[in-house]
Curated annotation (Swiss-Prot):
<feature type="binding site">
    <location>
        <position position="191"/>
    </location>
    <ligand>
        <name>alpha-D-glucose 1-phosphate</name>
    </ligand>
</feature>
<comment type="similarity">
    <text>Belongs to the bacterial/plant glucose-1-phosphate adenylyltransferase family.</text>
</comment>
<keyword id="KW-0320">Glycogen biosynthesis</keyword>
<dbReference type="InterPro" id="IPR005835">
    <property type="entry name" value="NTP_transferase_dom"/>
</dbReference>
<keyword id="KW-0547">Nucleotide-binding</keyword>
<dbReference type="InterPro" id="IPR056818">
    <property type="entry name" value="GlmU/GlgC-like_hexapep"/>
</dbReference>
<dbReference type="Pfam" id="PF24894">
    <property type="entry name" value="Hexapep_GlmU"/>
</dbReference>
<protein>
    <recommendedName>
        <fullName>Glucose-1-phosphate adenylyltransferase</fullName>
        <ecNumber>2.7.7.27</ecNumber>
    </recommendedName>
</protein>
<dbReference type="GO" id="GO:0008878">
    <property type="term" value="F:glucose-1-phosphate adenylyltransferase activity"/>
</dbReference>
<keyword id="KW-0808">Transferase</keyword>
<dbReference type="GO" id="GO:0005524">
    <property type="term" value="F:ATP binding"/>
</dbReference>
<dbReference type="GO" id="GO:0005978">
    <property type="term" value="P:glycogen biosynthetic process"/>
</dbReference>
<dbReference type="Pfam" id="PF00483">
    <property type="entry name" value="NTP_transferase"/>
</dbReference>
<comment type="subunit">
    <text>Homotetramer.</text>
</comment>
<feature type="binding site">
    <location>
        <position position="165"/>
    </location>
    <ligand>
        <name>alpha-D-glucose 1-phosphate</name>
    </ligand>
</feature>
<dbReference type="InterPro" id="IPR005836">
    <property type="entry name" value="ADP_Glu_pyroP_CS"/>
</dbReference>
<keyword id="KW-0119">Carbohydrate metabolism</keyword>
């Protein structure tokens, strides 16, 4: 097997519990985004656009939908013979193996896969962020700095910094301190969960971490702080582009709404850094004679007979006559019957809302989760149902 300079390991096994009923049946990287994509499309497309042709996808939580979607990787041009895409679930071997105990342990359990390609560098990715990035430029920076580890970093608002791993650097970009989700952050320079390691350094760090009974086997909590304590050369690579962590209902909703901005739509379809997907091939949209569309994305295979405003409509969705959809996200193959009012709602895949329903109705006081209503996948909402804003519907209401 030809030695690879760099291979990617994509962590895609997370449940995404903060997304509630959206991840009841699928892992977070498989959740639909922007009407056309799955969240994992962004990391896979970045690999393809960066000429990284060997990707291990580490799955765990309810992996069937994600495995089926990725298939052989051809949608991202990652189906090459010498490399390509590989699904890497947890396994039990003769002397080791179990469920992945953390991000670092997930890589540790797949060291045989990495050794097979014997790369000089390892790119560690998360499968649950929305961004477009040239990893080759980051690798060039890593080499230029003679770094042993490079973390991609982005400046976030100070009030949000405690949600992330944050780093303090010197004038040359070398990381002096790193802390995962600190209550009082020293910096607003946040880790994006994108790391480049020299493979020999990572291998040694993983073996050491695995022997520590006190470790959570997590890169941010354990591996990176230990490497800093050892005096290793860790550098930050400052990213100036668009990046969103969509790990909560609020952040997922807001990121979808941002896609409706004209400059963001153009960016997704830019040929130089195009985002690829394995979306099902469907017929074009059908807009009825009374349909009204304002500032919305409408996926292929949709039938729109009502009115849609400031919304993201994924593929295969049906909206009946007299219905009004406002500031909402309709996930694939969901159905809205006649005379429905849907406001600031995320409607799960294959969910059905019968006629005359009112979903996202105003309530007194401050509603939870910024007033975003969420209807889970495959749920049936009976005729005439009224659901207040900010509610999470996890099971059929009748």
């Amino acid at each position: 097997m030809r030695k690879k300079e760099c291979i990617a390991m994509l962590l895609a096994g997370g449940q995404g519990s903060r997304l509630g009923c959206l991840t009841r049946n699928i892992p977070k990287p498989a959740v639909s985004f922007a009407g056309k994509y799955r969240i994992i499309d962004f990391s896979l497309s970045n690999c393809s656009n960066s000429n990284i042709d060997t990707v291990g996808v580490l799955t765990q939580y309810k992996p069937f939908a994600l495995n089926t979607y990725i298939n052989m990787g051809s949608a991202w041009d990652l189906n090459c013979l010498n490399g390509g895409i590989h699904i890497l679930p947890p396994f039990v071997g003769e002397a080791q193996g179990s469920w992945y105990k953390g991000t670092a342990n997930a890589i540790y359990q797949n060291m045989d896969f990495i050794n097979f390609y014997n790369p000089e560098y390892i790119l560690i990715l998360s499968g649950d962020h929305i961004y477009q990035m040239d990893y080759y430029e980051m690798l060039s920076y890593h080499k230029q700095k003679h770094a042993e580890v490079t973390l991609s970093a982005i400046a976030v608002p100070w009030e949000e910094a405690s949600r992330f791993g944050v780093m303090v650097t010197d004038a040359g970009g070398r990381i002096i301190r790193f802390e995962e989700k600190p209550p009082r952050p020293e910096s607003n320079l946040a880790s994006m969960g994108v790391y480049i390691f020299k493979w020999d350094v990572l291998k040694e760090a993983l073996l050491e971490d695995e022997q520590d009974p006190q470790s959570d086997h997590d890169f941010g909590k354990n591996v990176l702080p230990r490497l800093l304590q050892q005096g290793r050369r860790l550098y930050s690579y400052l990213f100036h582009g668009y990046w969103r962590d969509v790990g909560t209902i609020e952040s997922y909703y807001n990121a979808n709404m941002e896609v409706l901005q004209e400059e963001r739509v153009d960016k997704f379809f830019e040929l130089k850094q195009r985002v690829f997907s394995n979306e099902e091939i469907l017929a074009p949209q059908h807009l009825g004679e009374r349909a009204k569309i304002h500032n919305s994305l409408i996926g292929n295979g949709c039938t729109i007979l009502g009115e849609v405003r400031d919304s993201v409509i994924a593929s295969g969705v049906y909206v009946g006559e007299g219905s009004l959809i406002e500031q909402s996200i309709l996930l694939p193959n969901s159905e809205i019957y006649e005379d429905v009012r849907l406001h600031k709602t995320i409607l799960g895949e294959n969910a059905i809302v019968r006629a005359h329903c009112r979903i996202g109705d105003k309530r007194e006081g401050n509603p939870p989760q910024e007033g975003i209503t969420v209807i889970g996948d495959h749920l049936h909402i009976p005729e005439g149902t009224v659901i207040s804003e900010g509610e999470n519907v996890r099971k059929d209401t009748a």
